[in-house]
Amino acid sequence: MRSAALMLTLLAVALSASAQDKPVSYSKDLQPIFKENCLSCHKPDKKKGKLDMSTYADFMKGGKQGSPVKAGDPAKSLIVEMISGKEPEMPEKGEPLKPEQVDLISRWIKEGAKQN
């Protein structure tokens, strides 16, 4: 019985570690977060702050405040500041992003903010 519990624990740790090792995908991981939390204000027909987040290319162009991402450096990326509760806090309307969503976006930026 103990060995079965140990095996399950080791399997859980291994699966958790492999999920962290997998690169963050813009289209699979981030696009759904942006769609749910950002696109009501940052889309082609309503670009608040002149920022369109509907596609990778438009998002990376940035808006009135410049590029939201400094690839490789989440701490210097405007989007991370805004979704981490700094002023102006984003999203303006609705609940703040969950910590795991902020972490995912930060990891993607640290990994180079690739279009994948």
Predicted regions and their residues:
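Positively charged n-region of N-terminal signal peptides that target proteins for export
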Residues: 1-5
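Aromatic- and Gly/Pro-enriched helix-to-coil junctions and flexible linker segments
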Residues: 17-116
